[in-house]
Amino acid sequence: MRVNDNQPFDLVTNYQPAGDQPQAIKKLVSGIEQGNRNQLLLGVTGSGKTYTMANVIAQTQRPTIVMAHNKTLAAQLYGEFKAFFPNNAVEYFVSYYDYYQPEAYVPSSDTFIEKDAAINDHIDQMRLSATRALLERRDAIIVASVSAIYGLGDPEAYMKMLLHVVEGDRINRDDLIRRLVEMQYTRNELEFLRGTYRIRGEILDVFPAESDQFAIRIELFDDEVDSIRWFDPLTGKMQRKVPRVTIYPKSHYVTPKDNLSRAIETIKDELQDQLKFFREHDKLLEAQRIEQRTRYDLEMMQQLGYTNGIENYSRHLSGRSPGAAPPTLFDYIPEDALLIIDESHVTVPQIGAMYKGDRSRKENLVNYGFRLPSALDNRPMKFEEWERIVPTTVFVSATPAKYELEKSDQIVEQVVRPTGLIDPEIEIRPVLTQVDDVLSEINIRKEMDERVLITTLTKRMAEDLTSYLKEYGVKVAYLHSDIDTVERVKIIHELRTGVYDVLVGINLLREGLDMPEVSLVAILDADKEGFLRSERSLIQTIGRAARNIKGKAILYADRMTDSMQKAIDETERRREKQIEFNKIHGITPRSAVRQKVKEIDTGEVFNDDDIEGKISEQARALSADERHILADPKLFAKHMSKLEKEMLKASKELQFEQAARLRDEILRLKAQMLH
């Protein structure tokens, strides 16, 4: 059922491909059209890889999943693609848990830990919106985290539950309500929230689970659909009249009645088998435990159609065989879809790691009678299962790993930047005088109003260096793992605006540290082999100075390691190619300028400085109570629910100014939590 097959991807931008972008776009598009299953875009820092991806999507016109390795990067990509494709369906699919404690059993202390979670209502809505977009239209881009490989409701069962309402159709009001209840919608006459409905005579209002703004009003007359309208649930203002509407289930785990009846019988059969096994092995406590828990769940499913933890019965509900791969987001995409894996050297290993951690926890639950063995099939995909199901793939990385290099049918380089900037010049200096040498380099950069990043190997070294630099009057900040996201963004903003001149850290490979103001990266103890001094890490760290026309990297080392040599050789190769390109085309390098991006929640457009400034202002403006609420996901969820109730109450009482103020407060706190 696709209602929007003809809408093309419409790339909206003032830029034209430049540098290596035109040839990279051409090669990738050609490779996709020729049937290459896997390709690699090897793009250096600051070469505009996201813009290249956007052009590939626009030229191939394929529904696309863009995978990132964490929520922060996914949110950043979502904002960028939303700006590139304002007329298409750009959606966001990440884990909807603000807080998640999975159920677990610790045999050594005989401790059972109940599942405890706080679900982010806004992200839940965005996930439902993402699957709706994939089912309804081809012009869909889904920006997802590794959450995409976790079990999701079966798409066939989900599609069976769709409710189509057409103007002029004959339908009984009670039948309509019954269908909504089967789709897990609840009646609520007091609070009209997402996933609820209300009845006023022959008028039925439904707030779709995937909608973030508008609700549906269905007016019946003598068992006939008289009119269908979209309206604003806050103000009651009508938006538009439509001839038909499709209402989607409230959850991905919704199940048709016949599937549920069949599942209940197969769960009973499995329970009997497990009881027999426990009794034969004289495990009477486990037998009692599994019988009590399972019978309670079955009763809930018979009475209400669902139960807490229903995902543990997903194998029965979907009718899959034992050990079969779970349905995931990838089951919702068409066969000719495109998958782009950003920062693939980090994202791909994550995909492989998810299954093992999940399995060991669940085995304890099964062995000690807390769950049936079929719960083991409620899991993320195994790596080999993921490999079998993925569509045409483009890996994107500045430093690809062995897997992507070996797997790719074509490796496309994007070394020349649109700005003409060349990779930083590299110098090697002795370790003995590294601290004093760094201090003199900082003073040189300070005179030119430029910034410095320094990376150390240990926390102790970073702390000592920060203290030493402060003694000499250097405006320095120390970025470490204990700093939360809001504070981190604030520090980065203050480095860019000159509050600090120097940033000291251990791992400078995280997002947000590509700043045009940084002209020097100093790598202390560069000859100590290890994760932070591997070839890939060195190349990426050196690249932190690549957005400045005077970019330079100093490696402090007493010997040349293999990793250092490879990183230097690769950087020199890129520099030669970039310099030659600039010479042939008469390009004068210019420092990078960060483009405008859309914020994920408010939809407003700010440039990078505005966003960071706005967040740091919010951070400073937070009261002690608000900081306490933001630090505890459970408190945050309760507080948001309270504010939403107050907003709807104010709206019902026609106090629209108060409702608008509460709405802005909700958006402000949501943005704060996301960042």
UniProtKB/Swiss-Prot annotation:
Sequence ranges assigned to domain Helicase ATP-binding in this UniProt record: 30-417
Gene3D superfamilies named among the record's database cross-references: 6.10.140.240, P-loop containing nucleotide triphosphate hydrolases, UVR domain
SMART domains given in the database record: DEXDc (SM00487), HELICc (SM00490)
Keywords: ATP-binding, Cytoplasm, DNA damage, DNA excision, DNA repair, Excision nuclease, Nucleotide-binding, SOS response
Residues that hold ATP according to the record: 43-50
Residue ranges of the motif Beta-hairpin: 96-119
Origin superkingdom: Bacteria
A single MF term (Gene Ontology): ATP hydrolysis activity
GO biological process assignments: nucleotide-excision repair; SOS response
Cell compartments where the protein resides: Cytoplasm
GO CC annotations on file: cytoplasm; excinuclease repair complex
Residues covered by the UVR domain: 637-672
Record-linked InterPro entries: Helicase/UvrB_N (IPR006935), Helicase_ATP-bd (IPR014001), Helicase_C-like (IPR001650), P-loop_NTPase (IPR027417), UVR_dom (IPR001943), UVR_dom_sf (IPR036876), UvrB (IPR004807), UvrB_inter (IPR041471)
Keyword Nucleotide-binding: yes
Domain Helicase C-terminal: 434-601
Function: The UvrABC repair system catalyzes the recognition and processing of DNA lesions. A damage recognition complex composed of 2 UvrA and 2 UvrB subunits scans DNA for abnormalities. Upon binding of the UvrA(2)B(2) complex to a putative damaged site, the DNA wraps around one UvrB monomer. DNA wrap is dependent on ATP binding by UvrB and probably causes local melting of the DNA helix, facilitating insertion of UvrB beta-hairpin between the DNA strands. Then UvrB probes one DNA strand for the presence of a lesion.
Subunit structure and binding partners: Forms a heterotetramer with UvrA during the search for lesions. Interacts with UvrC in an incision complex.
Family, per entry: Belongs to the UvrB family.
Record comment regarding domains: The beta-hairpin motif is involved in DNA binding.
Protein name, entry field: UvrABC system protein B
Source organism per UniProt: Acinetobacter baylyi (strain ATCC 33305 / BD413 / ADP1)
Chain's gene name: uvrB
